[in-house]
């Protein structure tokens, strides 16, 4: 009596696949974000997502995320943050596979139909405030730095400050710009260990420059500012403001804005750690010109406040 031989069962490999195609074949249901996260874990290069822009109205928002993994950078845009992240991850996967000519469409399959649209998005403003309370910091301060564009297409730039940390956000409404700025600060806090930073360092040692102290100051630089015109061409206002800051003992920081102005010029903000905080906007044909313009505007403001009774 002959024995029938059954085919041998395939050997199971205990090794985990390391190539993208192998990982996708093993887990075909994984989303691009999950697949890229798995790839990053295996290679030691974890993907980092940063919210670049939030535009549109409440009923039709548009988000843009920048993704960095190793030496690769990609952008993704979509009607929700998750969709934008998925598209950025998909494009990064295509680059890793060596195919930059296509970006596979990613449908918004992550939306929960049981939740209304206003509950779909995260609330970075609220999250940042909660973080500040947990750490014992002062609550976030938001300042409108600029409003530009025609009435039907306004563009707002808002600065968000938590202690000495500052970020800017731009959007088609103040609320959107505020959310972007808060999101950027939250992302920054995720990359640093705030638990190891002493509170006195966060608060800073140069927060005592008030308007009254400026008015009563007899320092050389501030006295010169009070009596000098600020309309002389080719003046180095950056140096002039730096000299005033050193004399009055406040911090001076320039924040470059990624987006160009409606006229195609560079933009920046000059932030002075006076009490209260002073933020002035500047534009120019170069980054240096924008800094000089912001310094000029800041000096004009200081001069007005020093003379004002």
UniProtKB/Swiss-Prot annotation:
CDD domains: DSRM_PRKRA_rpt1, DSRM_PRKRA_rpt2, DSRM_PRKRA_rpt3. Belongs to the PRKRA family. Pfam families: dsrm (PF00035). InterPro entries: dsRBD_dom, PRKRA_DSRM_1, PRKRA_DSRM_2, PRKRA_DSRM_3, RLC_Component. One of its GO terms (cellular component) is RISC complex. This is Interferon-inducible double-stranded RNA-dependent protein kinase activator A homolog A. Homodimer. Interacts with dicer1 and eif2ak2/pkr. Also able to interact with dsRNA. Residues 1-22 are annotated as: Disordered. Residues 31-98, 123-191, 236-304 form the DRBM domain. It is found in: Cytoplasm, Perinuclear region; Nucleus. GO terms for biological process: regulation of regulatory ncRNA processing; siRNA processing. Activates eif2ak2/pkr in the absence of double-stranded RNA (dsRNA), leading to phosphorylation of eif2s1/efi2-alpha and inhibition of translation and induction of apoptosis. Required for siRNA production by dicer1 and for subsequent siRNA-mediated post-transcriptional gene silencing. Does not seem to be required for processing of pre-miRNA to miRNA by dicer1. Keywords: Cytoplasm, Nucleus, Repeat, RNA-binding, RNA-mediated gene silencing. Its main location: cytoplasm. SMART domains: DSRM. GO terms for molecular function: double-stranded RNA binding; siRNA binding. It comes from the Eukaryota.
């Amino acid at each position: 009596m002959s024995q029938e031989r059954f085919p041998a069962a395939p050997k199971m490999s205990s090794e985990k696949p390391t190539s993208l195609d192998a990982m996708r074949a093993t887990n075909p249901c994984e989303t691009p974000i999950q697949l890229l996260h798995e790839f990053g874990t295996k290679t030691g290069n974890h993907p980092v997502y940063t919210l670049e822009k939030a535009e549109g109205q409440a009923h039709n928002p548009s988000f843009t995320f920048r993704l960095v993994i190793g030496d690769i950078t990609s952008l993704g845009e979509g009607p929700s943050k998750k969709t934008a992240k998925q598209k950025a991850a998909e494009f990064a996967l295509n680059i890793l596979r060596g195919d930059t000519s296509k970006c596979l469409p990613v449908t918004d399959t992550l939306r929960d139909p049981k939740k209304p649209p206003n509950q779909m998005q995260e609330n970075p403003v609220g999250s940042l405030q909660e973080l500040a309370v947990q750490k014992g910091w002062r609550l976030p301060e938001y300042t409108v730095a600029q409003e530009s564009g025609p009435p039907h297409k306004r563009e707002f730039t808002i600065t968000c400050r938590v202690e000495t940390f500052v970020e800017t956000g731009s959007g088609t409404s103040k609320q959107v710009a505020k959310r972007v700025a808060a999101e950027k600060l939250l992302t920054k806090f995720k990359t640093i260990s705030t638990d190891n930073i002493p509170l006195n360092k966060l608060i800073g040692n140069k927060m005592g420059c008030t308007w009254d102290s400026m008015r009563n100051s007899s320092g050389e630089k501030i006295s010169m500012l009070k009596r000098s015109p600020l309309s002389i061409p080719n003046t180095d206002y950056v140096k002039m403001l730096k000299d005033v800051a050193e004399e009055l003992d406040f911090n001076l920081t320039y924040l470059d804005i990624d987006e160009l102005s409606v006229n195609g010029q560079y933009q920046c903000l000059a932030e002075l750690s006076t009490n209260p905080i002073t933020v002035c906007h500047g534009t120019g044909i170069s980054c240096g010109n924008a800094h000089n313009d912001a310094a000029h505007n800041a000096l004009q403001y200081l001069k007005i406040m020093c003379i004002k009774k």
